[in-house]
Amino acid sequence: MSKKASMHKEEKHEKGQHKQPADEQPLGIDPEVSSGEASEGACQESDAKVQELEKALEEAQQQAEKYRGEMMRFAADFENFRKQKERELQAAGTRSIENTIRELLPLVDDMKRVMEHAPDDLEQSGEARPYLEGVELLWKNLLKWFERKGVKQIEACGQKLDVNFHEAITQVDHPDAEPDTVIEEYQTGYVMGDKVLRHAKVIVAR
C-alpha cells in the first residue's frame, strides 16, 4: 500500500470518530427537564398576567361604580333643583295673579255699587241705560275671569260668623237671627283656593 493511500485511510478514520449522531444531545442537558422548566415558567408568567388583569378589572369596576354613584347623586340633585324651580315659578305666578285680583277688587266693588244704587229713573232713561248695561257686563266678565283663576266669593249672609272668612264691622239687634249670624254683607270677600284674598266685611246679629 502506498503512503498516500495510508494517509487517506487514517483521515477517514479520524473523521468517523468525531462525527456525532443526529439524535445525540449535548452532554449535561436533559430534554425532559428543560421542557418542564420552560412550561412551568410560561404558566407562572400566564398566572401573573391573569392576576394583573383581574386586579385591573376590579379597579375599573370600582371606578365605574364610583362614577355611577356620582351620576345618580347628580341626577337626584338636578331633579330636586328642577322641581324646586317649578314650585318657585308656580308660586310666583300665583302671587302675580293674587296681586292682580286684589288690585281689581276695588273696581269690582265700585261697579257693584253703581248697579245697586242707580236711581230707578236713571235705569229707565234711554241715554243712561246702555252705560249701566255696559257696567253690568264688565262686572260679570270680571267675575267669570275670577272663577277661571279659581277665585270665589265668600258666602256671608245667613252664615255663622267665621273669623277666618268674615270681618264683623258692627253688631245689631235682630229679632229673627241668632247671635253672631251674618245679617248683612257690607263688602264681598274673596278666596283663591284655600287662601283668603279679602275677608268679607259683615254686620252680625247681637
Curated annotation (Swiss-Prot):
PROSITE patterns on file: GRPE
SUPFAM superfamilies in the cross-refs: Coiled-coil domain of nucleotide exchange factor GrpE, Head domain of nucleotide exchange factor GrpE
Feature: compositional bias, Basic and acidic residues: 46-58
Gene3D superfamilies: 3.90.20.20, Head domain of nucleotide exchange factor GrpE
GO-annotated biological processes: protein folding
Assembly and oligomerization: Homodimer.
Protein name from the UniProt record: Protein GrpE
A cellular-component GO term for this protein: cytoplasm
Predominant location category: cytoplasm
The family this protein is said to belong to: Belongs to the GrpE family.
Coiled coil residues, start to end: none
Compartments it resides in: Cytoplasm
InterPro entries noted in UniProt: GrpE, GrpE_coiled_coil, GrpE_head
An example molecular function term from Gene Ontology annotations: protein homodimerization activity
Keywords: Chaperone, Cytoplasm, Stress response
Function recorded in the entry: Participates actively in the response to hyperosmotic and heat shock by preventing the aggregation of stress-denatured proteins, in association with DnaK and GrpE. It is the nucleotide exchange factor for DnaK and may function as a thermosensor. Unfolded proteins bind initially to DnaJ; upon interaction with the DnaJ-bound protein, DnaK hydrolyzes its bound ATP, resulting in the formation of a stable complex. GrpE releases ADP from DnaK; ATP binding to DnaK triggers the release of the substrate protein, thus completing the reaction cycle.
CDD domains, per the entry: GrpE
Region (Disordered): 1-64
